[in-house]
Amino acid sequence: MAPEENAGTELLLQSFERRFLAARTLRSFPWQSLEAKLRDSSDSELLRDILHKTVKHPVCVKHPPSVKYARCFLSELIKKHEAVHTEPLDELYEALAETLMAKESTQGHRSYLLPSGGSVTLSESTAIISYGTTGLVTWDAALYLAEWAIENPAVFTNRTVLELGSGAGLTGLAICKMCRPRAYIFSDCHSRVLEQLRGNVLLNGLSLEADITAKLDSPRVTVAQLDWDVATVHQLSAFQPDVVIAADVLYCPEAIMSLVGVLRRLAACREHQRAPEVYVAFTVRNPETCQLFTTELGRAGIRWEVEPRHEQKLFPYEEHLEMAMLNLTL
């Protein structure tokens, strides 16, 4: 195989691996590129490689996605195979048979590979809105913020980090594993989200602060219930964060007003000390929503500037979406 062709195959395998482990929508997979490569090849080796990068990947075997997702993926893979090859590939059909016999679940795993060779795995609800909240799934701005953090570890190293609206926990877990913070506080207001957060912290080998068996070189990790509308300056002062982050929390005007309110109270906590650095990442879905956020920041006396886009693309998220991150000065 020519070097260029080999590199193309490796990129294709990596794309399938990252998307499958993260349980991304099937339409986001590079199916056309796969079909083209299958037509150029007389054997099924590429499909075997894809199978071992996805369904049979060690991370997937330990923490599989939902049964329905794996079944749909394998069905699509078989379609592509049958379109260009007459000889069946037994491994594909055996893997599909396993999913047909497996029991369905409302939870599934999503895994994200880290540059260190490790990974972050999340147990998530298979429904976008579940238990009356959107916090049980990972949104794309959380992946964007995690990438930025991995590229800028000095912002977090040996510092106390407070995350507002942690959701499933992807950003914080990536920071804890890659950026060596002194302490990390995950926070959310919904009880079901907090329960899932605690589970995901433990799933990734981290210990919650009260655990006396916690590793000495690990950050102190806390999962806190925090309702932005009722949190007082006194309650917020207990966190003493050096850095505050949030991702995909600008989904409606009410949330924006609540976020700006809690940021004002965080600023008041440290009147005799340096205010925390604040980074807010979001997907630009509605320009009016973004405009409202910056307007309310101005009214609150909070300065902001757009953080330059980072270079690394580590995680699979929708490339057509516009992402942005603001650096706020309280």
UniProtKB/Swiss-Prot annotation:
It comes from the Eukaryota. It catalyses: L-lysyl-[protein] + 3 S-adenosyl-L-methionine = N(6),N(6),N(6)-trimethyl-L-lysyl-[protein] + 3 S-adenosyl-L-homocysteine + 3 H(+). Its main location: cytoplasm. Keywords: Acetylation, Cytoplasm, Methyltransferase, S-adenosyl-L-methionine, Transferase. S-adenosyl-L-methionine binds at W139, G165, S166, G167, W228, A247. The keyword Heme does not apply. One of its GO terms (cellular component) is protein-containing complex. Coiled coil: none annotated. The modification N-acetylmethionine is found at M1. Its EC number is 2.1.1.-. GO terms for molecular function: protein-lysine N-methyltransferase activity. One of its GO terms (biological process) is peptidyl-lysine trimethylation. The keyword Acetylation applies. It is found in: Cytoplasm. Interacts with FAM86B2 and FAM86C1P. PANTHER family: HEPATOCELLULAR CARCINOMA-ASSOCIATED ANTIGEN (PTHR14614), PROTEIN-LYSINE N-METHYLTRANSFERASE EEF2KMT-RELATED (PTHR14614:SF117). Catalyzes the trimethylation of eukaryotic elongation factor 2 (EEF2) on 'Lys-525'. Belongs to the class I-like SAM-binding methyltransferase superfamily. EEF2KMT family. This is Protein-lysine N-methyltransferase EEF2KMT. It comes from Homo sapiens (Human).
